[in-house]
Amino acid sequence: MNTSDLFEQIPSKRRSLKDLATYIKTKSGNSPNYSIFLGAGASVTSGISSGTQLVEEWRKEIYELSSSSAYTDVKTARQYLIDKESSWYDPTNEYSSLFQKKFDLPAQRRRFVEKQVDSKLPSIDYSYLVSLFQSAYFDTVFTTNFDDLINEAFYQFSRERPTLCAHDSSIKGVSVNSSRPKIIKVHGDYLFDSIKSTLNETESLEINTKEKLIEFTKKYGMIFIGYAGNDRSWIGPYISRHFLSLYPLLVRRRRYSRGERYPSALCGCHSL
């Protein structure tokens, strides 16, 4: 389901950034109304390649190797992969299928991720987000990212120390009612062997992670930042069945190039 489909099916749920800022600000005591969900786009301003950038790079490389032809355009490359490489290529989930093709072994994928995130530091945008946690507008962030930027941001910009859950076994004990900042890594951490990036890996979440995510979305709204929803875990069916019926929806869809700042998402919220 893409943005246009959502706007067409539930136009009454569409909200502006100004509306969102009002919803965030209107809360009772220190209890927030929303949790944050960070995707790969949230790390672009820290110098980490976005999923879109990696897909473009891998598609070109694999097309040229497979076809023995020079890369000309996206449409030609995609059609070739659909026609000739359908045994592994999934056009609806290019990131995972291309990632698995390029890095066949889990150890290779982990080393690639480690190289991507090595020495990267939180951008100023993360300081805005941390300040919102300090003001009790949020207390939980879910993320599909393997980097440690949000955790490092708390140590760099705040005296608060978050609870970090980077493995399924550590998630079960997280309390939805705790006011301490919580970071829950949906796909794991690159330091563990169990990171989830390929098609089969992202099709299923560990049971504790899935249950905790459902528990939080029943109590809080969810604000997505930099997340395209291209994994095949819970996002499609769960949102369709539950999430859209529980909370108003704000959809903001755009691509970020390397070094581009968030135009208003975090900075706008900071004006609270």
PLM feature spans:
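Extended basic-aromatic, gly/pro-enriched interface segments that bind polyanionic ligands
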Residues: 226
